C-alpha cells in the first residue's frame, strides 16, 4: 500500500493577479445563494467521491466539509463561490476568509466531471484566492493530497508554492 501525503500550498496575496471574468454569456462565477445549497453540495461531494485519491479518507473528510458547508450557508453572506452554466451549478469552492487560519480553501475548487479540463478549476481557484485576500490575509493556504489533480495542475498556478504537510483530519480545508 502506497502512503499518500499531503501538500500545503501558499500564495502571497500581493502577488495575485486581478480578477477577470472572461466567460461566455451562459457561464457565471459568483457567491452562492441559499437556494443553490443542494446543487452546490452535490458538486462538492461528488468531486471527492468520484476521485480515487480521496478513497481512504473520504468517509472522515466529507462530514467535516459538510459541517463547514452548513455553517457557511447559515450566514447571510455565504463564503462559497459557484460557477454556473445557465441555471446549473457546475463548480463550487467553499472558503474560510479569516486572515489567520491554517487553511483557507475548505473544499478547494470542485468542478463537475463533465466540465473539467476547461479552465474552470483555475478560474475558481483564482477568484477564491482573491476573495480570501480581500479579508486581510497576507498569505493564503490550501491543503490537498499530493496525488490530487489540484496538486498537479491547478494549485501551482498564481504563484502557489507547495510544502509537505501533516494533515490531521480535525484540520479541515482541503482541495479537490
Predicted segment positions?
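A short beta-loop-alpha structural element at the N-terminal edge
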Residues: 28-42
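Conserved active-site alpha-helix within GNAT-family acetyltransferase domains
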Residues: 1-2, 122, 146-164
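Conserved GNAT acetyl-CoA-binding A-motif
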Residues: 132-144
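Conserved acetyl-CoA-binding loop-helix of GNAT-fold acetyltransferases
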Residues: 111, 117-130, 134, 153-157
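Conserved beta-strand in the GNAT
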Residues: 80-82, 88-97, 103-105, 110
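Acyl-donor-binding surface of acyltransferase catalytic domains
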Residues: 1-25, 168-170
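Conserved GNAT-fold acetyl-CoA-binding loop/helix
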Residues: 48-68
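Conserved beta-strand-loop-alpha-helix junction that forms the acyl-donor binding cleft
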Residues: 142-152, 168-173
Amino acid at each position: 500500500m502506497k502512503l499518500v501525503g499531503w501538500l500545503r500550498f501558499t500564495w502571497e496575496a500581493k502577488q495575485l493577479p486581478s480578477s477577470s471574468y472572461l466567460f461566455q454569456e451562459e457561464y457565471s462565477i459568483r457567491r452562492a445563494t441559499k437556494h443553490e445549497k443542494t446543487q452546490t453540495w452535490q458538486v462538492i461531494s461528488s468531486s471527492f467521491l468520484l476521485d480515487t485519491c480521496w478513497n481512504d479518507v473520504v468517509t472522515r473528510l466529507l462530514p467535516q466539509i459538510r459541517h463547514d458547508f452548513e455553517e457557511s450557508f447559515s450566514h447571510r453572506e455565504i463564503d462559497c463561490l459557484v460557477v454556473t452554466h445557465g441555471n446549473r451549478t457546475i463548480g463550487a469552492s467553499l472558503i474560510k476568509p479569516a486572515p489567520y487560519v491554517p487553511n483557507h480553501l475548505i473544499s478547494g475548487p470542485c468542478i463537475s466531471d463533465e466540465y473539467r479540463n476547461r479552465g474552470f478549476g483555475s478560474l475558481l481557484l483564482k477568484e477564491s484566492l482573491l476573495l480570501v485576500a480581500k479579508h486581510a490575509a497576507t498569505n493564503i493556504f490550501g491543503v490537498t493530497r499530493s496525488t490530487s489533480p489540484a496538486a498537479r495542475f491547478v494549485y501551482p498556478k498564481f504563484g502557489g508554492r507547495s510544502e509537505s504537510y501533516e494533515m490531521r483530519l480535525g484540520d479541515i480545508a482541503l482541495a479537490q
